[in-house]
């Protein structure tokens, strides 16, 4: 029987397993992967390649907040970290700003803070925000970044058994255990990033991910635009749920807003005569007030109290959020 000229389809080919290949040790000409880029690769491969491989940079609110959190730790001079051959087993100290590199690991890092407890060195990475509510105490990208720092310390000859993350907003410290699984994930991420950058390939953007809106490289990455060209459409964002609350606007010059009684009244009163006589008009929006429950129509019923200096807006129910008494209305042009 003559062989067919038609190439076999993908279904006819035998399945082949994937073999994980690590990148070779870095040389003097190769760029070393920063520990922060290990974090970025696990978080979003496209972000890591754009930043480290292609040099794309953009400032964001989160980035500026992170820089300020790091600067807050620089409150004064600290002793230098002794050489591992000189560091005593009973020695304890705190130090900052240590640079480490390893061609064998293909890694480099700028360590924020180092705790030395009885000769054991603990790298501490400072993060903005609160500690996440996860079993490990932190997400994998942050733990891998600390693990990369710990591996560099071990490579330099220091004893490092664990790492730590400091969350500035919640002021909590989380211990990072250097498990075999975490070390493997860190080395695989380092190798994959080096191989991807060396190949010149740019990973595809994340598919409709919640990570994208706050990313500093969103205008460069263009995930929605690329998804549209690939699929012809993008996933529609679900509309927000309808709220029964209505805004309340106060437009009386020199007025203030406050609760009149427990029944949910809002009183709009004039302040002192000298303030109300100012020429600047006052237009202020006073939050969202729940007026749906117990009301035949979601509107605010107005009741005049007979006085020329005050007006009351009677709500059928109490506030969804309590309004602070004597909340001032600020002038706006």
Curated annotation (Swiss-Prot):
GO terms for molecular function: 4 iron, 4 sulfur cluster binding; manganese ion binding; single-stranded DNA 5'-3' DNA exonuclease activity. Signal peptide: none annotated. Keywords: 4Fe-4S, Antiviral defense, Exonuclease, Hydrolase, Iron, Iron-sulfur, Manganese, Metal-binding, Nuclease. Its EC number is 3.1.12.1. Mn(2+) binds at residues 70, 112, 125-126. It comes from the Bacteria. One of its GO terms (biological process) is defense response to virus. [4Fe-4S] cluster binds at residues 44, 212, 215, 221. Pfam families: Cas_Cas4 (PF01930). Its cofactor is Mg(2+); Mn(2+); Cu(2+); [4Fe-4S] cluster. It catalyses: exonucleolytic cleavage in the 5'- to 3'-direction to yield nucleoside 3'-phosphates. NCBIfam families: cas4. CRISPR (clustered regularly interspaced short palindromic repeat) is an adaptive immune system that provides protection against mobile genetic elements (viruses, transposable elements and conjugative plasmids). CRISPR clusters contain sequences complementary to antecedent mobile elements and target invading nucleic acids. CRISPR clusters are transcribed and processed into CRISPR RNA (crRNA). This may be a 5' to 3' ssDNA exonuclease. Belongs to the CRISPR-associated exonuclease Cas4 family. This is CRISPR-associated exonuclease Cas4.
